[in-house]
């Protein structure tokens, strides 16, 4: 057979690997370790798409490579299986979310196995398994004991259609929910919060120690949002009330001409005048209908209402009006801001909208035309006049502290983590609320608190989860007869994914989250590969939980993931009409190399776009594996371009990768393999071993494959192939195309055993040296010939070769040679007359 029969060979080796537990994690204590982690998937009903295997193939290449280098390799897979989609589907269809999830997992696992990934399935985890979420609940109880999990009445992003509150991060810029695109309104509710802010400084500082891209680190830094400034206290005129604002520019306090409170600020009702009461109440209601993102959108029209009250500016005693406006959030900072319209664009727009005074306190701009937001020397600022920013801040903070109306302060943009969901399909929060007003955590001996099975998973309608409907589960009685009620909120999907990488290390431990010695052996994760869309939330939450567990003495490292790599997106093919509107692929026909709308006949422009069901451009890996084989898909996705680039899917590229594998198959199966080395491939073979090794180490898989192609081209020009080079080449291609490599290994090694643990080939540096070099021959200073000669010839040998060259002989025919200058490895210069 002259081609790679993937339909026969791939299932054969997948069966072999499963039967022999080929990829069981090594436990030889004398070997170094390598922990390669994929971001585990949510098992959706749609199954895998071709974007999933890109990251999975990258970690699989590294895992196979490291096994061959003698490492114990931990390369696991599992399922992030709680979450809204399964529950929504269950409500829509009447199916049990657990059954639906189990079916989806089975499908995902089938698809993953068909791609030949070397996972240790003995370590599979599932966040919905009570044996797993027992430890998710255990971590929560520890957070609760340490005061890091607490209840608070907070305004939440309520989504009526989903029947739950969602985190700020799950609200889209247009004010709708990320899941489903439903309207989001603000509503005060009792919620569980995790005090991630207690770890803000460590989460920020420890980024410096990580091998992550600067862009991802910057996203986390910006999310944490550290600001150094001052808290300033303003008294409310004619009352004993006061409020505090945080500002990074206390030096501009002389320019504060009004203050703004969040509509939800606790002082608003107390200070609002009778005349303004109705307007304030109306405005508060309107603000409650908007999400935080919609409220803080810089582009939106400025709205607000005066409360009728005045604050006293603490540095000059001036009375300045107190307004409420929805761009100030009660959950951010102190829920109050001092407005300096001359030097802040949003304040300037607000002042212009409502005809409020604008006082310049930094020279350099025209504040009637626009806010001046650069630095300058202080003016109109009494004792700060003439000072620069740094000196003025130091002086004003000292003044405020002396007067008792302010102090230096560090704040963070980071908010505490809203940890409750009013849904059924999640981990039950292990807390009991007693009728005597106390609350306690479910003791460890009673964990897991198992999610009860029920068909009634519709929201309760009271703002509580469907668990509130299950009286038998809900109501409990203590030994002393005191009655209690279980917490009805469940945890968010982020919970199980915040520590799953730890459970892979010891997945069957019933006594503890994981054994300390095993955690010491395997942590930190050596490389974590996944999409950049998780750059902030998942990674920040996982780092928070890891640091908490470090403080408890559970884990031995400060950070979970030493190296992080974000693969690019695989884009689909899309088509746009003259308006730029996208056209679904089933409405497109190809004629003479161009693309046309089937219904209108309009010629369309082809362009890459994110794969989506609506555009009908999603590529199913099952179809690719059926037609081309798993190894083709793996090689193609790695050869498309740099791993971190977003690149459009191409059927032609897929066919090219398949042709390459057929050429590899023919090379090994058809070429005469011999025990004697004639040296013809010494240089290209050793170059290939060196290049592929170095490029796998640096995740440059596309250039590694390109070098494998160079070797195949060179080998095909020879009549025979040296057996050690054949073996070495098969080992080099094995991480990329493992099924093909296993099959070809049997051809040349005939051991009957897997290639997986055969020692990785090495290169001979001496074989990389060029044996021949090019020299130039000059006659009267002009280049007349270029010759390939053996390296390091003597002057005499160079001269002899140059003078014997036919082209040179023709040039000097009939002329007298005055002298010949030879420079070894460079040139021969012939002087004639």
UniProtKB/Swiss-Prot annotation:
GO cellular component: cytosol
Principal location: cytoplasm
Motif window: 'HIGH' region: 41-52
Intrachain disulfide bonds: none
GO molecular function, one term: aminoacyl-tRNA deacylase activity
EC id: 6.1.1.4
GO BP annotation list: leucyl-tRNA aminoacylation
Entries under PROSITE patterns matching the protein: AA_TRNA_LIGASE_I
Annotated ATP binding sites: 613
'KMSKS' region (motif): residue ranges: 610-614
Enzyme class: ligase
UniProt keyword Oxidoreductase present: no
One Pfam family cited in the UniProt record for this chain: tRNA-synt_1_2
Record localization: Cytoplasm
Name listed for the protein in its UniProt record: Leucine--tRNA ligase
Organism: Streptococcus pneumoniae (strain 70585)
Protein's gene: leuS
């Amino acid at each position: 057979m002259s081609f790679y029969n993937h339909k026969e060979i791939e299932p054969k080796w997948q069966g072999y690997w499963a039967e022999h537990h080929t990829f069981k994690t090594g436990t030889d204590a004398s070997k170094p370790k390598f922990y390669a982690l994929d971001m585990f998937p949510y098992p959706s009903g749609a199954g895998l798409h071709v974007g999933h295997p890109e990251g999975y193939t990258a970690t699989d290449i590294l895992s196979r490579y490291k096994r061959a280098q003698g490492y114990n390799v931990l390369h696991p897979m599992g399922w992030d299986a709680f979450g809204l989609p399964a529950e929504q589907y269950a409500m829509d269809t009447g199916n049990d979310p657990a059954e639906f999830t189990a079916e989806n997992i089975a499908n995902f696992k089938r698809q993953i196995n068909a791609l030949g990934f070397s996972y240790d399935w003995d370590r599979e985890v599932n966040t919905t398994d009570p044996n797993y979420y027992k430890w998710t609940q255990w971590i929560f109880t520890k957070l609760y004991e340490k005061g890091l999990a607490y209840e608070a009445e907070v305004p939440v992003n309520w989504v009526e259609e989903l029947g739950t509150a969602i985190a700020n991060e799950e609200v889209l810029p247009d004010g709708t929910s990320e899941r489903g695109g439903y309207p989001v309104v603000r509503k005060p509710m009792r919620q569980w919060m995790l005090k991630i802010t207690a770890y803000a400084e460590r989460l920020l500082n420890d980024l410096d120690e990580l091998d992550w891209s600067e862009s991802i680190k910057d996203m986390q830094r910006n999310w944490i949002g550290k600001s150094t400034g001052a808290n300033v206290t303003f008294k409310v005129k004619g009352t004993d009330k006061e409020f505090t604002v945080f500002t990074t520019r206390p030096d501009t306090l002389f320019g504060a001409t009004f203050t703004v409170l969040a509509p939800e600020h606790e002082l608003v009702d107390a200070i609002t005048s009778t005349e303004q009461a109705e307007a304030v109440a109306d405005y508060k209601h309107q603000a409650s209908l908007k999400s935080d993102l919609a409220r803080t959108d810089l582009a939106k029209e400025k709205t607000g209402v005066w409360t009728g009250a005045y604050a006293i500016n603490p540095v000059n005693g001036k009375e300045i009006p107190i307004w409420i406006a929805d761009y100030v959030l009660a959950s951010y900072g102190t829920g109050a801001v001092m407005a300096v319209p001359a030097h802040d664009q949003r304040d300037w727009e607000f002042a212009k909208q409502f005809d409020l005074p604008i006082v310049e306190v930094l020279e350099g701009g025209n504040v009637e035309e626009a806010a001046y937001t650069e630095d300058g020397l202080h003016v109109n600022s009494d004792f700060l006049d003439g000072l620069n920013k740094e000196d003025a801040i130091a002086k004003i903070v000292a003044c405020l502290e002396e007067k008792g109306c302010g102090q230096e302060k560090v704040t963070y943009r980071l908010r505490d983590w809203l940890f409750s969901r009013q849904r059924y399909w999640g981990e039950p929060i292990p807390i009991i609320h007693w009728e005597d007003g106390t609350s306690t955590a479910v003791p460890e001996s009673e964990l897991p608190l198992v999610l009860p099975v029920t068909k009634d998973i519709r929201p309760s309608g009271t703002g509580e989860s469907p668990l509130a409907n299950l009286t038998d589960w809900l109501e409990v009685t203590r030994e002393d007869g005191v009655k209690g009620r279980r917490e009805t909120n469940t945890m968010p999907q982020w919970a199980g994914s915040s520590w799953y990488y730890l459970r892979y290390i010891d997945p069957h431990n019933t006594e503890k989250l994981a054994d300390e010695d095993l955690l010491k052996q395997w942590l930190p994760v050596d490389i974590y590969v996944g999409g950049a869309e998780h750059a902030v939330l998942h990674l920040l939450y996982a780092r928070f939980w890891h640091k908490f567990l470090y403080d408890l003495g559970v884990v031995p490292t400060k950070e979970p993931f030493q190296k992080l790599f974000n693969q690019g997106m695989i884009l689909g093919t899309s088509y746009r009409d003259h308006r730029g509107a996208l056209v679904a692929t089933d409405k497109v026909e190809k004629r003479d190399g161009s693309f046309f709308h089937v219904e209108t006949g309009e010629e369309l422009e082809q362009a890459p776009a994110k794969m989506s069901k609506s555009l009908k451009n999603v590529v199913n890996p099952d179809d690719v594996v059926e037609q081309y084989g798993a190894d083709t898909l793996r090689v193609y996705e790695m050869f498309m371009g740099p791993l971190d680039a977003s690149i459009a899917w191409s059927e032609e590229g897929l066919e090219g990768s398949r042709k390459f594998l057929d050429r590899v198959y023919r090379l090994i199966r058809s070429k005469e393999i011999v025990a004697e080395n004639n040296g013809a491939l010494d240089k290209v073979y050793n170059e290939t071993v060196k290049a592929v090794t170095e490029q796998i180490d640096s995740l440059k898989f596309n250039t590694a494959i390109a070098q494998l192609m160079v070797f195949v081209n060179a080998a095909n020009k020879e009549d025979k192939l040296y057996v050690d080079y054949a073996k070495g080449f098969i080992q080099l291609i094995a991480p990329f195309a493992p099924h093909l490599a296993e099959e070809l290994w049997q051809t040349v090694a005939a051991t009957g055993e897997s290639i997986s643990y055969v020692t990785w080939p090495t290169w001979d540096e001496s074989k990389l040296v060029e044996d021949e070099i090019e020299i130039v021959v000059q006659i009267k200073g002009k280049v007349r010939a270029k010759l390939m000669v053996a390296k390091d010839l003597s002057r005499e040998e160079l001269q002899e070769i140059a003078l014997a060259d036919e082209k040179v002989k023709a040039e000097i025919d009939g002329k007298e040679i005055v002298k010949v200058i030879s420079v070894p490895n460079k040139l021969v210069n012939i002087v004639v007359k």
